[in-house]
Curated annotation (Swiss-Prot):
Origin: domain of life: Bacteria
Record-given protein name: Large ribosomal subunit protein bL28
Region span, Disordered: 1-26
Similarity section: Belongs to the bacterial ribosomal protein bL28 family.
Length: 62
């Protein structure tokens, strides 16, 4: 399973590194996801949740 936020749907983004000579190489920007237990349909479940979703109170740990 991909490391994608269960609540917000955030996923890693891709782009390029650019050197001083403007050469480009592919890179990815990861997201800060934590594996936490939350209630899903009334039952506890371990899912990947972004740190921002946890801080903003969109989800509550069990």
């Amino acid at each position: 399973m991909a490391r994608k936020c269960y609540v917000t749907g955030k996923s890693p983004k891709s782009g390029n590194n650019r050197s001083h000579a403007l050469n480009k190489t592919k890179r990815t920007w990861g997201i800060n996801v934590q594996k936490v237990r939350i209630l899903v349909d009334g039952k506890p479940k371990k899912v990947w949740v972004s740190a921002r979703a946890l801080k903003s109170g969109k989800v509550e740990r069990v």
